[in-house]
A protein has these predicted regions:
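Active-site-adjacent substructure of cysteine-protease-like catalytic cores
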Residues: 78-97, 293-366, 371
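Predominantly the structural core of cysteine protease catalytic domains
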Residues: 213-217, 221-225, 251-341
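Structured segments of extracytoplasmic/periplasmic soluble domains
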Residues: 52-57, 106, 218-230, 285-286
Length: 421
């Protein structure tokens, strides 16, 4: 089933800091609200899911009196079979800019897709942060795929008797237990840097204006800020303690410029872009052991790298094209993952009308802490599975563990450290 995406106040801008700079505008019509049915998680239930998530989050500093509202922040997709606009997910914002949560509208998927304790998020923020359009699209694809995998897994279950119940699935009901956090690593990176002033104060002048630093330079600089290396480059000394405390330090702008030059930045006023393949060589020239080339996204590699105290660079594209069978990607963004937590719960499946457990399975969820390189905007925890549209949720089943064909070329550069070979 094809889906088309539209939402209120959104002009669909695709990635701007990319291998090839291209901004695409697509006309759209406002989507009117639809009646909520049992097919969808209601707004009221979405708020309850946020409150439950906070209650079970042992590290959360959120107070119980914080009020969340959804208002008109609803992302819709077009069902081309029914010609209806159906809700895909909601954005619940806390009072006074004290955080937000992205909640799936599908009752069959993980409720909380993303969670942050700072700032608010609006669909119209895509006008300033164009890469959000790509991210919202990813969420929709993940929800669709997770629906499919969850249905398959719940039928299969963990009991040898379960395949015999495939045709009798309506006669069973699931009763999930409470989530329990099993592991957490707090964010490694303390800075919240961006692409404009003061970070671009040493960038080239174009028509009297400073070029943007580019997301490649911002992500790379933030990873270096954690390792506090190199001690200097190209005649500029890096006092990391001062630079992390004071982003107006001239050394910060010089760091961004040095990185930009090394990755062969295509400087621009509206967007600066560089190829992701140039990132490993930049690290090597600035004193690091050369990281491997960008590799296919794997949440397990991201988590393993974070456990080794190595923040991970993540790259993605919003446009995939093909010419004579040759694929290529356009319009990209680069960001950082530097922390994570895992939680799990047991789900018991009962035959309707019986109190005896027929079979059980375990659901596991990993949330990655992401630093988007937007001066701290939208930094928070995001469900790890959304970055691979072909993967289902983390179930102990070969059916859900297969690697999918991710349409947006999401790649990672893990295990970045300062040890020279």
């Amino acid at each position: 089933m094809k889906t088309y995406y539209s939402f209120i106040f959104l002009i669909l801008f695709l990635f701007s800091c990319s291998d090839e700079i291209e901004v695409i505008k697509q006309p759209f019509s406002p989507v009117s609200a639809i009646n909520e049915t049992p097919t969808y998680r209601t707004k009221e239930n979405a708020i309850i899911e946020v409150e439950n998530f906070i209650k079970n989050d042992g590290s959360s500093t959120r107070i119980s009196s914080t009020n969340y509202v959804i208002n008109n922040e609803v992302y819709y997709y077009r069902d081309t079979v029914t010609q209806k606009n159906n809700p895909s997910f909601y954005i619940a914002n806390a009072d006074n800019g004290n955080g937000y949560a992205i909640v799936s509208a599908s009752p069959n998927t993980t409720p909380i897709i993303a969670y942050s304790e700072t700032g608010n998020l609006l669909l119209s923020d895509t006008l300033r942060y164009k890469e959000l359009s790509f991210f919202f699209n990813l969420i929709q694809k993940y929800i669709s795929n997770t629906d499919k995998y969850k249905t398959e897994f719940e039928i299969e279950g963990t009991s040898s008797e379960v395949p015999q119940t495939r045709h009798r699935l309506p006669h069973y009901e699931k009763r999930p237990r409470e989530w329990k956090e099993t592991e957490r690593i707090q964010p490694l990176i303390s800075v919240k840097w961006g692409q404009r002033s003061p970070y671009n104060n040493a960038a080239p002048l174009i028509q009297g204006q400073r070029a943007l630093t580019g997301c490649v330079a911002t992500a790379t600089a933030q990873v270096m800020s954690y390792h506090e290396k190199p001690s200097g480059y190209n005649g500029v000394t890096y006092n990391w303690a001062e630079m992390k405390k004071n982003p107006n330090s001239p050394a910060v702008a010089h760091l961004f410029r040095n990185i930009g030059d090394l990755v062969k930045m295509d400087w621009g006023i509206d967007a600066s872009g560089a190829k992701r393949k140039n990132i490993p060589e930049c690290f090597e020239k600035m004193g690091y052991r050369k990281p491997g080339n960008p590799q296919a996204y794997s949440q397990w590699d991201v988590i393993t790298s974070i456990k080794a105290k190595c923040p991970v660079i993540i790259c993605g594209n919003s446009v995939k094209k093909s010419i004579i069978g040759i694929k290529y990607y356009k319009n990209g963004h680069v960001w950082v993952s530097d922390g994570y937590f895992q939680r799990e719960r047991q789900v018991d499946v009962y035959r309707k009308g019986s109190d005896k457990v027929h079979h059980s399975y375990t659901e596991k969820e990993n949330y990655l802490h992401l630093n988007w390189g937007w001066d701290g905007f939208s930094n928070g925890y995001y469900l790890a599975g959304i970055f691979n549209g072909g993967d289902g949720p983390s179930f102990p089943s070969s059916r859900a563990a297969g690697k999918g064909n991710f349409p947006y070329n999401v790649e990672i550069i893990p295990y970045i450290n300062i040890i020279k070979k």
